[in-house]
């Protein structure tokens, strides 16, 4: 057993949580001491954040300044004849390296004066006018070439004494670095990002004469807003099924078969939200690959990154489930599924993102007990949701995984597939245990207030069956994790809520190993299991709203191909 220190649950283990003999049904989670105290590592360098760089004070000695040569600065203006679409923007002045070797200048910010105001000067991106030359017509510079757009700065004086003292920049160069001028560069360090050379040597900039260009946003795929009024709702009885299982188990293949075989009036399918995972803000799949390659078990930074990844995996899955729940007609009753009912098939449920994969990561020592418990508390399910758990043997699964050759799955080996299959089986056994025992009885067993023998005697359940299910379920792991904190009411609420949400689901288990290259046969097996299960119910749902969601999801998914 672990010590009584609470810090043991905030730090991930530095070794595998447990190493089962094999990921077979007879050996899952048996004789495992989950709270073995790991050896404390003195290596903390990876968790220490680098100290922020201090602000430059600018106390370095400045060279003698030579008399300034009057010059006009190029500034954009708004042409009255050709109004720009960016009229409302006031663009910040750009810093620019001149094309002349050894010369460096900054574009001064505009100064609002009476002469400028009277002539109607303002900032825009339609054309350019020269500020500081009041005698010239502003519109005469609208069509200047790129070479004529910036003035030439005269070279340094030919005095030999000046050659020994190089020209000082607005940002003083000292000790191999640029020290920002308090007035011009204090709030604009990000402007240097467009330069192709290093800031340590600004005189070697290769894009000195290039005009700064505005980045245009990439074209987004067309979509149907799911939040707009879609007209009169069209309510039908539909069975909501979520395909779950290990990667390359056949979920997407079966979903595409249903989409191609059945019409939109019979079945609607929602694919994986791959675009959100890979293109919105960050690529979470690449992050997972990087963590598995570089991060070490037992590091706080590792578990923090994994929590961030799992939350991003769970976000679209939770919102899809909530959208389907909002589509249910109020005060409608669920009824047993029939041959003429509609289908709503979704690839992945939040069960995998918040329960199964966090369980795998915790067992591998990558995720701390505390973070696993927090993710568990975010899980939720709704009445009428069905989990179709699909599986194939490990060797076939590994062969399929390598055949499709995704970059984000190169780090997955046979042992990892076994662990994922075992975690899905552990979650299923936990649900199965709740079908034999009430939530209150399960809580008492997990909190150590009652034994399994007493629960079997009270509920009238065979002890052999209950013991086998209990030992293969994730409830053994959960009871060991919360054993030292079972008297905390928040821990009790999280466990009670998790058991309540998990018991709401309905499961069907489909072994696809017997249906290799037989997708219609696999669909027939799934269909028959759903029809024979009297506990699976349909919900009265707005099929028009769900179709808008499904079409948007498929259009977004197709834009990635």
Curated annotation (Swiss-Prot):
Residues 1-14, 112-122 have a biased composition (Polar residues). Catalyzes the transfer of the gamma-phospho group of ATP to thymidine to generate dTMP in the salvage pathway of pyrimidine synthesis. The dTMP serves as a substrate for DNA polymerase during viral DNA replication. Allows the virus to be reactivated and to grow in non-proliferative cells lacking a high concentration of phosphorylated nucleic acid precursors. ATP binds at residues 245-252, 400. Homodimer. Keywords: ATP-binding, DNA synthesis, Early protein, Kinase, Nucleotide-binding, Transferase. SUPFAM superfamilies: P-loop containing nucleoside triphosphate hydrolases. It is an enzyme of class 2 (transferase). It comes from the Viruses. The active site is at 272 (proton acceptor). Substrate binds at residues 310, 406. Residues 1-22, 34-122 are annotated as: Disordered. The keyword RNA-binding does not apply. Signal peptide: none annotated. The gene is TK. This is Thymidine kinase. GO terms for biological process: DNA biosynthetic process; TMP biosynthetic process. Belongs to the herpesviridae thymidine kinase family.
């Amino acid at each position: 057993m672990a010590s009584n220190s609470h810090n043991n649950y905030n730090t991930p283990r530095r070794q595998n949580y447990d190493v089962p003999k094999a990921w077979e049904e007879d050996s899952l989670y048996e004789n495992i001491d989950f709270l073995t105290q790991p050896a404390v590592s003195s290596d903390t360098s990876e968790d220490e954040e680098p100290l922020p760089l201090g602000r430059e004070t600018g106390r370095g000695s400045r060279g003698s300044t030579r008399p300034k040569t009057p010059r006009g600065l190029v500034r954009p203006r708004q042409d009255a004849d050709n109004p720009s679409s960016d009229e409302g923007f006031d663009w910040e002045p750009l810093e620019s390296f001149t094309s002349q070797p050894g010369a460096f200048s900054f574009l001064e910010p505009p100064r609002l004066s009476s002469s400028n105001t009277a002539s109607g000067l303002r900032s825009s991106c339609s054309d350019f006018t020269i500020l500081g030359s009041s005698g010239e017509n502003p519109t005469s510079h609208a069509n200047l070439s790129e070479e004529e757009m910036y003035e030439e700065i005269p070279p340094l004086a030919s005095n030999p004494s000046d050659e020994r003292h190089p020209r000082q920049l607005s940002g003083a160069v000292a000790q191999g670095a640029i020290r920002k001028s308090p007035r011009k560069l204090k709030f604009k360090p990000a402007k240097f990002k467009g330069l192709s050379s290093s800031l340590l040597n600004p005189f070697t900039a290769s894009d000195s004469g290039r005009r700064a260009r505005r980045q245009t946003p990439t074209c987004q795929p067309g979509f149907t807003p799911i939040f707009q009024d879609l007209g009169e709702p069209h309510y039908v009885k539909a069975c909501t099924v979520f395909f779950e299982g290990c990667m390359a188990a056949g979920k997407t293949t079966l979903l595409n078969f249903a989409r191609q075989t059945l019409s939109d009036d019979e079945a609607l399918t929602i694919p994986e939200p791959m675009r959100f995972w890979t293109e919105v803000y960050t690529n979470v799949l690449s992050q997972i690959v990087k963590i598995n390659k570089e991060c070490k078990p037992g590091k706080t930074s590792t578990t923090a990154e994994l929590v961030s990844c799992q939350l991003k995996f769970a976000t679209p899955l939770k919102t899809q489930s909530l959208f389907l729940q909002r589509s249910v007609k109020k005060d409608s009753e669920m009824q047993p599924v029939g041959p003429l009912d509609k289908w709503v098939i979704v690839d992945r449920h939040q069960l995998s993102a918040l329960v199964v994969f966090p369980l795998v990561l915790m067992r591998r020592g990558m995720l701390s007990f505390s973070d696993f418990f927090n993710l568990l508390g975010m899980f939720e399910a709704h009445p009428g949701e069905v989990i179709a758990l699909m599986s194939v043997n490990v060797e076939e699964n590994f062969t399929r995984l390598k055949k499709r050759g995704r970059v984000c799955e190169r780090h997955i080996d046979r042992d990892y597939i076994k662990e994922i299959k075992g975690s899905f089986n552990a979650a299923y056994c936990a649900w199965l245990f709740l079908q034999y025992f009430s939530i209150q009885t399960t809580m008492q067993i997990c909190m150590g207030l009652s034994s399994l023998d007493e629960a079997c005697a009270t509920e009238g359940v065979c002890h052999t069956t209950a013991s086998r299910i209990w030992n293969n379920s994730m409830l053994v792991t959960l009871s060991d994790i919360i054993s030292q904190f079972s008297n905390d009411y928040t821990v009790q609420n999280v466990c009670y809520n998790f058991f309540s949400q998990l018991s709401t689901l309905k499961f069907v288990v489909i072994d696809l190993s017997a249906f290799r290259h037989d997708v219609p046969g696999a669909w027939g097996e799934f269909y028959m299991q759903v029809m024979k299960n009297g506990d699976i119910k349909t919900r009265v749902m707005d099929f028009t709203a769900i179709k808008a969601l499904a079409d948007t999801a498929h259009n977004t998914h197709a834009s990635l191909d």
